[in-house]
Amino acid sequence: MPLSFSRLLSLAMAAVLSLSLAAPADAAKKKTGKAQTSQTRAKAGKAKKSTKPARSTKAKAKPRAVVAPVVQSKAQQLTLLYDQYWDASLKLNPLQATFQGESRYNDQLPNFLSPAFRQQSHDFTTLWLAKVEAIGPDGLSGQDLLSYQIFVRDARSALAAEQFPSWMLPINQFYNIASIAVVMGSGTGAQPFNTVKDYDNWSRRALGIPDLFDQAITNMRAGMQAGVVQPKALMEKVLPQLDAIIARSAEESLFWGPIRNLPADMPEADKQRITAEYKRMIEFRIMPAYRALRGFIATESLPACRDTAGLAALPNGAAWYAYDVRQSTTSDLTPAQIHQTGLDEVARLQGEIQNVAKQVKFRGNLPKFYKFMQTDKRFVFRSESELLDAYRGLQSRVQAAVPRLFATQGIPALDVRPVEPQRAQAAASGSYMRPNPHDNTPGIFYVNTSNLPARPRWEGESLFLHEGVPGHHYQLGLQQQLTDLPKFRRFGGETAFIEGWGLYAESLGRELGLYQDPYNYYGYLQNALLRSIRLVVDTGLHSQGWTRAQAIDYMLQNSAVTREDAEAEVDRYLAIPGQALAYKVGEMKISQLREQAQRELGPRFDVRAFHTEVLKDGSVPLEILQDKVQRWIATQKG
């Protein structure tokens, strides 16, 4: 699944999205103590009265019924805390709230790069973690235990991240606060522009942009003093991004988009007021902030950037990268282990691709075979309709075969649709949008029908398995039905699990009757090869001392990617260290757990039951997935 901008925002905001609750545990104990004292006194009073002779002339008064206090179970207490936590976290992080569809804070933009906010986030996390751990996991089971484990793990991870000064690196070409602001303010993102209140909300929120940009500059200056700066190649790419946003007038600005699309039913007086207000805001507040940021990067930041590539070149960089690897893969694998695994997988997959070349009687080495697969006209669809028909036919074949491997009850419908023309240029070959549970709309597998030579026939089967059935559509469709999960789990997710499942789904092609054509099998192998190369290159850059040029050369020598694509991939790994490892590590963990279950259960192994066990609890960290699958194996043995 290609990363959407909103998902990138969620990843980047993870460092500032923290936890909080004022925990009344001691107060509860005091209340219990008071209740016990009152009851003891009442009993003592009754005992004294009972020593007096009873009066036979008066009937005894009936004692009042004592209402027993409601005692909540641990699971109930935690459920309440999780709900309170979610509300508190959205209040702390208004941007995250907006991306989750929560509109209460659409007018707020805190300075989430400031020292004060970092301290507030730390206090938040510490308080919430203490409160949840005070209840403890004893006696919990099922989803309640999983929620506890995930919550505590995430909170401890957030606290561990504080030792690394990521706040000194607030901008790169991949995560860029300037781009976040323009996506929201242009009307193309999560910020709504439907009512007068919506327009006023953005007007108030945008007041925080200059302070946020000023703080980014302050933080980068601190990084320059501490030797914590970005690689020069990344910041060179930021300048043209800013140039594309900076405009001479409000009307030429991307921020003018909401004014171009004012609702027709908005009162004329409001239209005039909002138009004038937005013009002043864009020209006198937003654009000056962008120009100041661009000027700082060009004249101060860029000259101070480093020529080295990976995190290991920074102070405490090895430990920093090891943390990023644990956070991304949700496992205890070391960079060295992942690097070697990547080398082994690259060699294995290249051997498989060579076998395909022999099978189709191709004469030439691997680079020539790669070029043939990319350029031969037999692999090009002749029309948009032919491309769509191919995917729809593929959908029918897969859905007919998938009950052999999956219990399919409750899976939402899936539509195959072309990408809208206005999105086509930037969209991937295929992508997935989950169904809307509120109006019973289906999930959508979007097919990019533009630039047909870039959509070869041989990529279709593995792409549909990954994005559609049984990939993201099954995984996210099932997770969406878990309405009793705490919101931090329903609206969160682990990349290693989500994308690992997508890659694992690709590996099921032959079991589902696909990859019979060797060229289609090549498509699967080529995707798997790229994900394995990521293991080598990401760890090479950040823990093995590789240069950027060395990483690019490795990709060019070992895969079919173009130089342009190789440069973009390598710069992505430099910008978000460790993130690209999650895909392959997740797939390999799911495959290893299946192999373990097959080995230990023998003829009792049921692949449908295994897949249900993997998916039934939603997205979980890989270490927790391993624990729960191993418990399932033990149960099946019993």
Where are the regions a protein language model picked out?
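N-terminal propeptides/low-complexity segments immediately following signal peptides
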Residues: 25-59
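Bacterial N-terminal signal peptides that target proteins for export
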Residues: 1-12
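Short stretches within intrinsically disordered, low-complexity N-terminal or propeptide regions
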Residues: 14-16, 44, 61-63
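N-terminal non-cleavable signal-anchor helices
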Residues: 4-6, 17, 67
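N-terminal maturation segment of proteins
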Residues: 48-638
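Bacterial N-terminal signal peptides
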Residues: 10-20
